[in-house]
């Protein structure tokens, strides 16, 4: 920008950097679509000229005649198949039909045939249901057998999948088994006899200086020994070991082993109690004579 002492107009002219319309830009013809319009008009004119001369009508007649012939051939083939089906099936023939309710194939017998409508009435074997079917939709009797085999295979596969899922769930939840063992152990603890009374309790007044030197009672058995089933007992602790189950045939090896271990435990319990009682009596006599 010139900083001179002249008039203001020369300063404004010197400060202008760009003026529209004064120069020729390289991209001035970007929006010029004159050539495109001319090409479109030329194509439309040539199409109209060909249409007037009849060149396009001949080409258009050829594809029109082709689809008319194909449906005619298809209809003939369909009629041949339907006629063959009508000749094949007779009243009383065994067949297989698709029941409209569930879409499955069932064995059936043809009760009547309508040759005009090309339909028939079938009676499903073993069910007695009647249904109208197209003759062309009837299947051979072996189709029902094959369908039943596939259904049975699918049902067996579903059952095996369910049993596999149940076994996996039982393996993943061991807490339920431990809870069952604990509940059985708790119920059996109420049936165990009480610990033997100390010397002097129920046997007359206790004498000074006497001590019970007999073997202590055995500890309670582990919970897994108490998991076997035994019949219920009346209220109160039993004096003798409980009898074995009434129906031993219904028990497995684990239950039989549990019953045997319980019997051993109870036998040792009462044996220790008896030995302690005898030793207490013997020591009491010795101290009495001394």
Curated annotation (Swiss-Prot):
Biased amino acid composition, Basic residues: 65-79
Function description: The SMN complex catalyzes the assembly of small nuclear ribonucleoproteins (snRNPs), the building blocks of the spliceosome, and thereby plays an important role in the splicing of cellular pre-mRNAs. Most spliceosomal snRNPs contain a common set of Sm proteins SNRPB, SNRPD1, SNRPD2, SNRPD3, SNRPE, SNRPF and SNRPG that assemble in a heptameric protein ring on the Sm site of the small nuclear RNA to form the core snRNP (Sm core).
Modified residues (Phosphoserine): 25, 28
Protein's name in the database: Survival of motor neuron protein
Record-linked SMART domains: TUDOR
UniProt entry keywords in alphabetical sequence: Cell projection, Cytoplasm, Isopeptide bond, mRNA processing, mRNA splicing, Neurogenesis, Nucleus, Phosphoprotein, RNA-binding, Ubl conjugation
Record cross-link Glycyl lysine isopeptide (Lys-Gly) (interchain with G-Cter in SUMO2), residues: 48, 207
Tudor domain ranges (all copies): 88-148
The protein's assembly and partners: Homooligomer; may form higher order homooligomers in the dimer to octamer range. Part of the core SMN complex that contains SMN1, GEMIN2/SIP1, DDX20/GEMIN3, GEMIN4, GEMIN5, GEMIN6, GEMIN7, GEMIN8 and STRAP/UNRIP. Part of the SMN-Sm complex that contains SMN1, GEMIN2/SIP1, DDX20/GEMIN3, GEMIN4, GEMIN5, GEMIN6, GEMIN7, GEMIN8, STRAP/UNRIP and the Sm proteins SNRPB, SNRPD1, SNRPD2, SNRPD3, SNRPE, SNRPF and SNRPG. Component of an import snRNP complex composed of KPNB1, RNUT1, SMN1 and ZNF259.
Positions of the UniProt region annotated as Required for interaction with SYNCRIP: 276-290
InterPro entries per the UniProt record, alphabetical: Smn1, SMN_C, SMN_G2-BD, SMN_Tudor, Tudor, Tudor_SMN_eumet
Region (P1 (binding site for GEMIN2)): 10-41
The keyword Nucleus is annotated on this UniProt entry: yes
Gene Ontology terms describing biological process: axonogenesis; DNA-templated transcription termination; microtubule depolymerization; positive regulation of RNA splicing; regulation of neuron projection development; spliceosomal snRNP assembly
Ranges of biased composition (kind: Polar residues): 170-190
Subcellular localization(s) per the UniProt record: Nucleus, Gem; Nucleus, Cajal body; Cytoplasm; Cytoplasmic granule
Free-text note regarding domains: The Tudor domain mediates association with dimethylarginines, which are common in snRNP proteins.
GO molecular function, one term: RNA binding
Region (P2 (binding site for SM B)): 237-264
Any single Pfam family the record assigns to this protein: SMN_YG-box
Ranges where the record places region Disordered: 1-29, 54-85, 151-219
Positions of modified residues (Phosphothreonine): 22, 66, 82
SUPFAM superfamilies per the UniProt record, alphabetical: Tudor/PWWP/MBT
């Amino acid at each position: 920008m010139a900083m001179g002492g002249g008039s203001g107009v020369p300063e404004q002219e010197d400060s202008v950097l760009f003026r529209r319309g004064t120069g020729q830009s390289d991209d001035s013809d970007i929006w010029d679509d004159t050539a495109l319009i001319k090409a479109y008009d030329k194509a439309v004119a040539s199409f109209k000229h060909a249409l007037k001369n009849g060149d396009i009508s001949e080409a258009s007649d050829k594809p029109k005649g082709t689809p008319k012939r194909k449906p005619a051939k298809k209809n003939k083939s369909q009629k041949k198949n339907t006629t063959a089906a009508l000749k094949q099936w007779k009243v009383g023939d065994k067949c297989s039909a698709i029941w409209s309710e569930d879409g499955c194939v069932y064995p059936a017998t043809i009760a009547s045939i309508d040759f005009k409508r090309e339909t028939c009435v079938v009676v499903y074997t073993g069910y007695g249901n009647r249904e109208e079917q197209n003759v062309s939709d009837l299947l051979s009797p072996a189709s029902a057998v094959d369908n039943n085999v596939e259904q049975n295979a699918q049902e067996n596969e579903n059952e095996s999948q369910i049993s596999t899922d149940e076994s996996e769930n039982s393996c993943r939840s061991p807490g339920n088994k431990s809870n069952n063992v604990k509940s059985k152990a708790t119920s059996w603890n109420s049936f165990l006899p009480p610990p033997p009374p100390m010397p002097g309790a129920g046997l007359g007044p206790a004498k000074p200086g006497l001590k019970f030197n007999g073997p202590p009672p055995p500890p309670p058995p582990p919970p897994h020994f108490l998991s076997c089933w035994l019949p219920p007992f009346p209220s109160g602790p039993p004096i003798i070991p409980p009898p074995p189950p009434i129906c031993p045939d219904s028990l497995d090896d684990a239950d039989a082993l549990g019953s045997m271990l319980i019997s051993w435990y109870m036998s040792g319990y009462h044996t220790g109690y008896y030995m302690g009682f005898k030793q207490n009596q013997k020591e009491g006599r010795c101290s009495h004579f001394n």
